[in-house]
């Protein structure tokens, strides 16, 4: 399992830099902005993570720019021909779109895992 920190709708994977002897992280999935943080202790790391996001949101407010989101709500999924065919047939049987079928499947998976 990976180490993930979450705050105000943003998340980052945490790693340890042996070279710098500190914990570090970067908010992934932003196309135009870079938010990184670090700390020598977990407490420092958490504080710097929250401060980095708060600073980013404050900067966006001051510059009247919209903060980027890590997930836009759409993605491309490569299912392979066989799984795609089965999903399409099942969506037709249920009288729903294939998109709705995949959303239901992901929601069901997340609920049980």
Annotated model-derived regions:
Residues 41-55:
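A short, charged, amphipathic alpha-helix used as a generic interaction element across diverse proteins
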């Amino acid at each position: 399992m990976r180490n993930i920190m979450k705050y105000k709708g943003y998340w980052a994977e945490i790693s340890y830099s042996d070279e710098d002897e500190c914990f570090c992280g970067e908010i992934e999935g932003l196309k135009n902005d870079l938010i990184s943080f670090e700390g020598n202790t977990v407490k420092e790391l958490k504080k710097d993570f929250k401060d980095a996001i708060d600073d980013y949101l404050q900067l966006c407010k001051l510059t009247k720019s919209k903060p980027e989101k890590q997930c836009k709500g759409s993605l491309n999924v490569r299912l392979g021909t066989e799984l795609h065919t089965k999903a399409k047939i099942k969506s037709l049987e249920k009288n729903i779109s294939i998109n709705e079928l995949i959303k239901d499947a992901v929601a069901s998976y997340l609920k049980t895992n």
